[in-house]
Design a protein with these regions (language model features):
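C-terminal accessory segments enriched in acidic
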Residues: 3-5, 9, 26-56, 156, ...
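Hydrophobic h-region of N-terminal signal peptides that target proteins for export
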Residues: 15-24
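Short, glycine-/Ser/Thr-/acidic-enriched flexible segments
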Residues: 93, 180, 355-356
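Short glycine/proline-enriched loop/turn "hinge" motifs that connect secondary-structure elements
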Residues: 115-120, 233-239, 340-344
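Soluble metallo-hydrolase cores and metallopeptidase-like ectodomains found primarily
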Residues: 59-122
Length: 405
């Protein structure tokens, strides 16, 4: 059975289960994997006019990849806790061979080339999204980025020549549209409705909710890892099918298969820059990672590239680029970006997008409005400027040059 025939049967089976309603007319019961969940009926209403460029579900993203990726290659880099394949799209040539030391050893030797090997000067860009299942903006962004690399245009037909130009100058591109396949599969929506300033539905679907429809909330969702799926309530899209939020996995203990897949692929590819796309900001915002101190100044420069351009494009809360200051960037705690940095030496950065389902209030009570087109523009501008940064600064080999040369 080929992929597309299999998809038809899977979709039919899912629709039958998803369509069954429980006795309470305000709750809907559906199954994802081996788990059955009840969610308020109203929370599962989709936007009526979903744009054609908004490709975000596991099924639709997978179909898009197999229909459209011609210049790159699709690789299955691992499987989720629920057994779902994690797909990456890669362009260019991978690093060859290995170094002579561990990453930690190379830091002790004061020459990262000892870890990265003879292709140390290569530049490798890694973009990933969907670490949390209902943070759709980054998924849509990477799908459209793949479209640009393949055709020169996003799925709206808009050309991005500078993305094509920068991508051609990078030795290796790695794009992972959905990291947390389980969390995304748990949410049957392609695109939620917009609820104005009310973020209840987004938080319920993303960070989870209680049986009465109230939200667990952030950061409360991080108090219990793993979550017990046997308890009443809905876990949201944060955890995988083992109940683990892989953004905060047990990195030095028993790692989840998604985390291990990222670790193994990162050790193989040894990227310079990882852009970890999330949702949870008033305006698109880059977070300062908890990482090697030597990369702090590198982050400052990356921040200015991205945030300044977003400001110029009127996608920030200010129209004055001179107001952009990396010292005001939110500071992340120890998380998967820290672990990836200390695992392979990459500068790994969280970027938070606004949500399509609600608009945050800003000063004076006004709403920071973001249309789907604006959200996509911000995603692609972020990737474009991050790529430009990598091209113009030269990557890890130039950020921390070897004193042994």
């Amino acid at each position: 059975m080929n992929y597309f025939t299999q998809k038809k049967y899977q979709t039919f089976f899912f629709v039958l289960i998803f369509g069954s309603l429980c006795l309470n007319a305000q709750m809907r019961t559906y199954q994802s994997g081996n788990f059955t969940f009840k969610v308020p009926e109203a929370y599962l209403r989709e936007r009526k006019d979903i744009p054609s460029f908004w490709i975000s579900t596991v099924e639709d993203v997978t179909e898009f990849l197999y229909r459209n990726v011609k210049k790159g290659e699709i690789e299955i880099i691992g499987h989720s806790a629920g057994g779902r394949p994690i797909r990456a799209v890669v362009y260019g040539n991978a690093r060859q061979g290995k170094g002579t030391s561990t990453f930690s050893g190379s830091l002790g030797f004061r020459d990262v080339k000892a870890y990265r090997g003879r292709n140390h000067d290569m530049t490798v860009y890694w973009g990933m999204a969907g670490v949390h299942g209902f943070e759709l903006e980054g998924i849509v962004g990477i799908v459209n980025l793949i479209s640009v690399i393949e055709t020169g245009k996003d799925l709206r037909g808009k050309a991005w020549p500078e993305i094509s130009e920068q991508a051609a100058k990078i030795d290796r591109l790695i794009l992972i549209p959905i990291v947390n396949q389980d969390g995304r599969a748990r949410l049957p929506l392609r695109m939620g409705k917009n609820y104005g300033s009310d973020n209840t539905v987004h938080e319920y679907l993303n960070t989870g909710g209680n049986p009465d429809g109230t939200i667990i909330g952030w950061p409360q969702i991080k108090e219990f890892i793993p979550l017990d799926f046997g308890k009443p309530g809905f876990p949201g899209g944060y955890p995988n099918d083992a109940g683990v939020n892989i953004q905060h996995d047990d990195f030095f203990g028993k790692r989840q298969p998604e985390t291990q897949a990222l670790f193994d692929f990162a050790a193989l590819e040894r990227p310079d820059l990882i852009m970890n796309m999330h949702t949870g900001a008033v305006y698109m915002t880059m977070h300062r990672p908890f990482c090697e101190p030597v990369l702090s100044a590198v982050f400052d420069s990356l921040y200015m590239y991205v945030q300044k351009r977003l400001t110029i494009e009127n996608l920030q809360g200010t129209t004055k680029p001179e107001n952009i200051n990396p010292q005001r960037a939110p500071r992340d705690a120890y998380n998967i970006d820290t672990a990836l940095n200390l695992h392979c030496g990459a500068l790994s950065v969280v970027v938070e997008s606004p949500s399509h389902t609600f608009d945050n209030k800003i000063s004076g009570g006004a709403l920071a409005l973001h249309t789907p087109d604006m959200l996509l523009d911000a995603q692609l501008i972020c990737h474009r400027e991050a790529m430009r940064f990598l091209v113009e600064t030269g990557g890890r080999s130039k950020w921390t040059p070897s004193p042994n040369r």
